[in-house]
Swiss-Prot record:
Part of the beta sliding clamp loading complex, which hydrolyzes ATP to load the beta clamp onto primed DNA to form the DNA replication pre-initiation complex. DNA polymerase III is a complex, multichain enzyme responsible for most of the replicative synthesis in bacteria. This DNA polymerase also exhibits 3' to 5' exonuclease activity. GO terms for molecular function: 3'-5' exonuclease activity; DNA-directed DNA polymerase activity. This is DNA polymerase III subunit psi. It catalyses: DNA(n) + a 2'-deoxyribonucleoside 5'-triphosphate = DNA(n+1) + diphosphate. One of its GO terms (biological process) is DNA replication. Gene3D superfamilies: DNA polymerase III, psi subunit (3.40.50.10220). DNA polymerase III contains a core (composed of alpha, epsilon and theta chains) that associates with a tau subunit. This core dimerizes to form the POLIII' complex. PolIII' associates with the gamma complex (composed of gamma, delta, delta', psi and chi chains) and with the beta chain to form the complete DNA polymerase III complex. Interacts directly with the chi subunit (holC). It comes from Haemophilus influenzae (strain ATCC 51907 / DSM 11121 / KW20 / Rd). Keywords: DNA replication, DNA-directed DNA polymerase, Nucleotidyltransferase, Transferase. It comes from the Bacteria. Its EC number is 2.7.7.7. Belongs to the DNA polymerase III psi/HolD chain family. It is an enzyme of class 2 (transferase). The keyword Transferase applies.
Length: 134
């Protein structure tokens, strides 16, 4: 125990630890920068994945044009420009609940969860077909 913890304990002040701190991470008023052209929504953190870099390349985008959010964060997003969304989830209810938060949607791509998508050639082909549609 450090000095601060001991002092709080002596004063009778309870310390609380968040059970799921990632839920609160950046949860209030996420404003989307002007350079963002794609928002990925996934329960996993995919921002540093080489596969995401390949998807961005197929969309003629760079890493700085992509914003990766989770399903808890998207409801707090503020977007003013037309944008593409890529929703990664096998849960169709979760996707249906998320669609109203896809503001200024130019296109919405859907894929299974990131874990499934990485190893599923059919899912990759389906994403490619979605990208090719006007």
């Amino acid at each position: 125990m450090n000095r601060r913890d001991l002092l709080l304990q002596e004063m009778g002040i309870s310390q609380w630890e968040l059970y799921r701190p990632e839920v609160l991470q950046g949860s209030v008023g996420i404003s989307v920068a002007e350079n963002i052209r794609l928002i990925t929504v996934s329960d996993e953190n995919i921002s540093s994945s080489p596969l995401l870099a390949d998807v961005l390349l197929s969309l003629n985008l760079k890493k700085e044009n992509c914003l990766c959010l989770n399903y808890d964060q998207i409801q707090h997003m503020e977007c003013k420009q037309p944008i593409r969304y890529w929703l990664l989830s096998e849960n169709s209810d979760q996707i249906d609940r998320t669609l109203p938060f896809c503001k200024q949607a130019e296109q919405v791509y859907r894929s299974p969860s990131w874990q499934q998508f990485q190893s599923n050639h059919q899912a990759k082909r389906a994403l490619w077909q979605q990208i090719q549609q006007p």
